[in-house]
Curated annotation (Swiss-Prot):
Lineage: Bacteria, Pseudomonadati, Pseudomonadota, Gammaproteobacteria, Alteromonadales
Gene3D superfamilies the record matches: Aldehyde Dehydrogenase, Chain A, domain 1, Aldehyde Dehydrogenase, Chain A, domain 2
Protein name, entry field: N-succinylglutamate 5-semialdehyde dehydrogenase 1
Keywords: Arginine metabolism, NAD, Oxidoreductase
Substrates-to-products reaction catalysed: N-succinyl-L-glutamate 5-semialdehyde + NAD(+) + H2O = N-succinyl-L-glutamate + NADH + 2 H(+)
EC number: 1.2.1.71
Species per Swiss-Prot/TrEMBL record: Pseudoalteromonas translucida (strain TAC 125)
Residues of the active site: 246, 280
Key word Oxidoreductase present: yes
Enzyme class: oxidoreductase
Annotated residues for binding of NAD(+): 223-228
Length: 489
């Protein structure tokens, strides 16, 4: 029998739907089993959140912040357990998941600052009375979390939503339910009132029931572009509901004149292969100049890529890359590599899959001669190389995508960067830094098929509350001068 994995109105209960499980993707051992939440249980979660809303929203910001800070204390106290749980379900090495657990704590202070600076009260004097701007919570919001950062990314929606006074229904990825369960238990220990956060676990049917529920006032999503587009279509014609989408990318990294080729190779690897290529900001396309300088960089990159250590999350000698999220995801990367070869690509470093596991080795594939390159996000460690003669040509080809999440330039030329910054279409643009690097205090998100709004702890404040403009006077009073045509005795 599976265990209670649904958290509704402050109570843990067993799902009434189909059974699902999560595995350690390194070996396919089952580490979590539960039954999905049904549409009726999703409805109960929405009702609980609605019932809890006014009491939570009526608390002062200081009172809400006190509970959120208690959650931060729980995160610190249980950081190693959280890091291990994330590693078990995602396959990422512990050095990475420990960083993720720490980032969850960091978002608390950033979210506090954001609320005060972006959604606080503003008063302006008027000849009679005052003009006020205040912010109010939307109400009941659904948060959909991804599998690649199952703690950190949902946290970037949930914390600012709660601080603003919303109540939440959290639907995590079905691939990382154990992380979600642990996170909710830490919220429970922090003293969060019943109904303020509700957890509904399950697969597609559970997610559809939540996304389609008429009782939610908004939906905050981090995940694939495909699912995000489905949600956007589903929400069409509902302008009264706030929809925040952070989706994928087909991200370019361009190299021009650089002196330190060793540093360039390092930043390319960090951009393309960290988290086994399962960051939405990972470099998918590498643009190298033709000629000897580009040749040297490519040769060094090939050598360094072949030397990347891939291994288990808990190896004493920590690997750079762990497992991908599943054997199916890993097999999908082999399929993508083969499809590119059929289009005319040349494999420079073969991506290889250890069958029945999520392990793959990183791959590099030369794609310059593919005339009609597919605009697909291959979510894994497969880097496509394009050679160029002209910088503007490279930028044009980098922009030839429906996505627009992250982009980067490695160059010793400030003029090149200024030109690149003006021309490139992306929400995150880095210079001489890996393009996977981002700050929770900065806007995180893109344009086009990469989404709307900015899902980070700081800028999330913008979509977690709406502004209310008021003109106010403490007592009803006649104006000093009446409008023309008025006479009031």
């Amino acid at each position: 029998m599976t265990h209670p994995a649904q958290f509704i109105n402050g109570q843990w209960s067993q799902g009434q739907g189909t059974e699902f499980s999560s595995v350690n993707p390194a070996n396919n051992n089952v580490i979590f089993q539960a039954n999905s939440a049904t549409a009726e249980q999703v409805d109960a979660a929405v009702s609980a959140a609605r019932e809890a809303f006014y009491a939570w929203a009526d608390k002062t910001f200081a009172e809400r912040l006190e509970i959120v800070k208690a959650f931060a204390a729980q995160l610190k106290e249980n950081s190693e357990e959280l890091a291990i749980t994330i590693a078990q379900e995602t396959g990422k090495p512990l050095w990475e998941t420990r960083t993720e657990a720490g980032a969850m704590v960091g978002k608390i202070a950033i979210s506090e600052k954001a609320f005060l600076e972006r959604t606080g009260d503003v008063e302006n004097a008027m000849p009679l009375g005052r003009a006020m701007i205040r912010h109010k919570p939307h109400g009941v919001v659904a948060v959909f979390g991804p599998y690649n950062f199952p703690g950190h990314l949902p946290n970037g929606h949930i914390v600012p939503a709660l601080l603003a006074g919303n109540t939440v229904i959290f639907k995590p990825s079905e691939l990382t339910p154990k992380v979600a369960e642990l996170t909710l238990k830490l919220w429970e220990k922090a003293g969060l009132p019943a109904g303020v956060i509700n957890l509904v676990q399950g697969e597609v049917a559970t997610g559809k029931a939540l996304a389609a529920h008429k009782g939610i006032d908004g939906l905050f999503f981090t995940g694939s572009s495909r699912t995000g587009h489905i949600l956007h279509e589903q929400f069409a014609g509902q302008p009264g509901k706030i929809l925040a989408l952070e989706m994928g990318g087909n991200n370019p990294l361009i190299i021009t004149d650089v002196e330190d080729t060793k540093a360039v190779v390092h930043d390319i690897i960090q951009s393309a292969f960290i988290s086994s290529g399962q960051r939405c900001t990972c470099a998918r396309k590498l643009f190298l100049p033709t000629g000897s300088k580009g040749d040297v960089i490519l040769e060094r990159l090939i050598t360094a890529t072949k030397a990347i250590k891939v291994g288990n999350y808990d190896d004493a000698d920590q690997p750079f890359m762990g497992s991908m999220i599943s054997s199916a995801a890993a097999a999908g990367m082999v399929k993508a590599q083969n499809e590119l070869v059929e289009l005319g690509a040349q494999v420079l470093v073969e991506l290889e899959h250890t069958v029945n596991t999520g392990f793959v080795t990183p791959g590099i594939i030369e794609c310059t001669n593919i005339s009609d390159f597919p605009d697909e996000e291959h979510f894994g460690p497969l880097l496509k190389v394009f050679r160029f003669d002209d910088f503007d040509q490279a930028i044009d080809k980098a922009n030839d995508t429906s996505f627009g999440l992250s982009a980067g330039l490695l160059s010793d030329s400030a003029a090149d960067y200024e030109h690149f910054l003006r021309r490139i279409r992306a929400g995150i643009v880095n210079w001489n830094r890996p393009i996977t690097g981002a700050s929770s205090a900065a806007p995180f998100g893109g344009i086009g098929a990469s989404g709307n709004h900015r899902a980070s702890a700081y800028y999330a404040a913008d979509y977690c509350a709406y502004p209310v403009a008021s003109v106010e006077l403490e007592k009803v009073a006649m104006p000093a001068t009446l409008s023309p045509g008025l006479k009031i005795d």
